[in-house]
Amino acid sequence: MNRSTISPVEARQQFRAGLIQPTSGWSAGFAQANLISMPQDLAYDFLLFAQRNPKPCPILEVLNAGETFGGIFGSNATEADIRTDAPQYRIYEHGELIDSPASAVDYWRDDLVSFIIGCSFTFEHPMVQAGVPVRHLEAGRNVPMYETSLACRPAGSLSGNLVVSLRMIPASQVADAVRITSRYPAVHGAPVHIGDPSLIGIDDINNPDFGDAPLSEPGDVPVFWACGVTPQAMVMSSKPPLAITHAPGHMLITDAPDLGFQVP
């Protein structure tokens, strides 16, 4: 199975059938997305949180309370279901992780408002096309992710620290990585930090908070991008009564072409 050539519809069907694996490298050319669903009475707070923190929380679409599919799935929108079509989910109650199921159907409520947020997996295909190596993708692993010491701007009852994803990039190609990813602001855009991880509160780069440990080659430099797992750090900090999210690195694959998010 060549995961890069699988259509978004086929990918969602496989995940709906129970396949659990990270989605880096899947359905090349199409945007991937983070998910967070929260009770309607917290929806405005989260919308404001995202507006105040656009690097980690670039909103692609907001669904009405109870809705389970959106326009980002294109002509296949009615076929898609955000409760089943990510490979794995996380269920939080009062900030505690209580389950990591393959389907969120059993926890779904009609008052949940869902936010679909851009994911940096979207710009990995353009990076590869330009010859910039993406180490975790090459190895079939999940991207490393870390909670930093950088506080997000709070909104209402919601607050938390920035989460970043890491890609080890050859020093000679860091400028290329910045140039390529800066053209995709809707999926986190340019890096937020390059170099010494301790400057953003990461004590051990080999022990990520989410995902797999990083892979590197001699001459690689750590490059960090804002990450859509930031809302999960916010959930753990703010402790809302219920939140449903994707599992880190296990994204919703949309029908939106990645070039649609590229700016000049």
UniProtKB/Swiss-Prot annotation:
Disulfide bonds: none annotated. Belongs to the D-glutamate cyclase family. The lineage of its organism: Bacteria, Bacillati, Actinomycetota, Actinomycetes, Mycobacteriales. Keywords: Lyase. Its EC number is 4.2.1.-. This is Putative hydro-lyase cgR_2449. It is an enzyme of class 4 (lyase). PANTHER family: D-GLUTAMATE CYCLASE, MITOCHONDRIAL (PTHR32022:SF10).
